[in-house]
Design a protein with these regions (language model features):
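Nucleic-acid nuclease catalytic cores
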Residues: 118-209, 231
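Short, charged low-complexity intrinsically disordered segments located at boundaries
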Residues: 85-89, 94-100, 118, 187-195, ...
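Charged/polar, solvent-exposed surface patches and flexible loops
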Residues: 57-60, 68-69, 89, 196, ...
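Short, charged low-complexity linear segments at domain edges
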Residues: 31-38, 192-221
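Short helix-capping/linker segments at secondary-structure and domain boundaries
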Residues: 68-77, 166-171, 235-237
Length: 237
């Protein structure tokens, strides 16, 4: 057998190297300090939550959205607002009498007053009617008007389509606008171009609100007559 060596116990002192982490080598550099977080390094702020109806208002007159978000003011109730509330209470009863074939659909399930929200889009809204089929969803927006369907209505309907896809997982290729006084249906194709325009408008609205810069008024002065914010547009009246 070889020579038996005795173990050196002298290094096991309280606080010595054997009792914890090894001692740093002579001349070793200290760990680099963690740099402070600069303002530009912080994660971006979440997008401003908006409502679908804001898109229609922004296309109608961008100042409406500005007054609601960047400079909240007390608005005056107009005849259009009060009349619109009364009509909404009757629409569901009228719609239940309609047949799905009037939308060009053979089958489907109808849901009224569907609340939709998307955290990814930072968007929410209440859809008047959603028709769900095996092919996907068909959003329906009710309008109490005999006038033509304007482009801002297309944008609003497209926003509902984006919400149906994002929150319910139902693909949408077509939506409908039901004009109650005329009892007719306007078909709106949810095209890639309309989708891009809708998303771009949401981005422009948020930039306006963050900048707190009042936009110009609508060039169509007839729209100002029944506006609930007309008293605040000193450069128009």
């Amino acid at each position: 057998m070889g020579e038996r060596r005795s173990f050196d116990w002298s290094g096991l002192r309280s606080g010595g190297a054997a009792s914890g982490a090894p001692e740093a080598a002579p001349g070793a550099a200290d760990p680099a300090p963690v740099p402070p977080v600069e303002p530009n390094d912080r994660p971006p702020a979440p997008p401003i939550p908006l409502r679908v109806n804001d898109l229609k208002q922004y296309a109608y007159c961008p100042r409406i959205v500005f007054y609601q978000y960047a400079m909240p003011v007390q608005r005056k109730a107009t005849f259009k607002m009060e009349h619109g509330k009364a009509v909404e209470e009757k629409l569901e009863q009228l719609e239940r009498r309609r047949k799905l074939r009037e939308y060009g659909l053979a089958e489907g399930t109808r849901r009224f007053q569907v609340w939709l929200t998307s955290e990814r889009l930072a968007l929410s809204g209440r859809l008047d009617l959603l028709i769900s089929t095996a092919r996907g969803g068909f959003p329906v927006d009710f309008k109490d008007t005999r006038e033509p369907v304007w482009h801002n209505h297309h944008v609003q309907l497209c926003a509902y389509a984006l919400l149906v896809e994002d929150s319910l997982g139902q693909p949408v290729s077509t939506g409908f606008i039901y004009r109650v006084p005329r009892d007719d249906v306007v078909v709106v194709d949810i095209t890639p171009e309309l989708r891009l325009e809708t998303l771009s408008m949401l981005q422009a609205m948020r930039a306006m609100i963050q900048a707190e810069r009042m936009p110009g008024p609508t060039p169509v002065r007839a729209r100002c007559t029944d506006c609930e914010y007309r008293n605040y547009c000193g450069d128009v009246f």
